[in-house]
């Protein structure tokens, strides 16, 4: 009797049309285009058996999408709903878009292209070499959030040397940043220089020697 009940239950879960996927819901997807990516990578199909939806495998499939930061999968045995909840990465800058169209980075330094995403207010980071790109990425994501938001573009001009364009106190300022050392000191120097009345018309700050900055 017990064996028969187990066999019947196994049949209902694995083969019967009672416990099938009736709806698939995507939560947290930034837009319709990115939702298509989620559905495709999940490999979950309407009409498929709920018992055969491997939540761990589905999660791993979706996490292959670069713009996905985290994902959670759930099944509802009563209404047949499979819910795909994703946490998308938040772009903080465009990165080498001349090489990869629409490529962005987040505050963890991850590179990704978010389908359908466009934000002309995001800064643009450029680097000629892969090493320069990694260093630019590390420096940019290490900046304090308020200073990072002031940057409109960033270029790795040479090995460990960077040029910034920023909007500071309502002014467009070009900053020869130098290497990534003494970040807090350099930001403090910028603030002090811009506060001086005699510097109200400057457009360039050279921080190659932060203890002896040059303004023009």
Which residues make up each language-model segment?
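Glycine-centered tight turns that cap/initiate beta-strands
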Residues: 67-70
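Extended, alpha-helix-rich binding/interface surfaces that flank or overlap catalytic cores
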Residues: 26
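Short helix-loop capping/hinge motifs at secondary-structure junctions, enriched
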Residues: 31-33
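Charged, solvent-exposed interaction patches on well-folded alpha/beta domains
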Residues: 1-14, 19-22, 35-36, 40-49, ...
């Amino acid at each position: 009797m017990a064996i028969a009940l187990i066999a019947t239950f196994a049949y209902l879960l694995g083969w019967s049309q009672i416990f099938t996927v009736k709806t698939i819901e995507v939560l947290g997807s930034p837009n319709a285009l990115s939702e298509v990516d989620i559905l495709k990578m999940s490999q979950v199909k309407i009409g498929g058996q709920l018992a055969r939806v491997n939540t761990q495998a589905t999660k791993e499939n979706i996490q292959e999408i670069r713009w996905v930061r985290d994902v959670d999968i759930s099944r509802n045995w009563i209404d047949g709903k499979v819910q795909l909840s994703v946490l998308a990465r938040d772009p903080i800058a465009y990165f080498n878009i001349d090489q990869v169209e629409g490529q962005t980075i987040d505050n963890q330094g991850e590179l990704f292209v978010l389908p359908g995403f466009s934000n002309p207010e995001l800064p643009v980071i450029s680097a000629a070499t892969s090493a320069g790109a990694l260093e630019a990425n590390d420096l940019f994501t290490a900046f304090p959030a308020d200073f990072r938001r002031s940057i409109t573009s960033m270029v790795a001009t040479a090995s460990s040397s960077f040029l910034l364009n920023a909007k500071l106190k309502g002014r467009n300022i070009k900053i020869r940043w130098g290497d990534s050392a003494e970040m807090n000191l350099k930001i403090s120097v910028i603030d002090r220089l811009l506060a001086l009345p005699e510097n109200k018309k400057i457009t360039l700050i050279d921080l190659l020697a932060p203890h002896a900055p040059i303004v023009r």
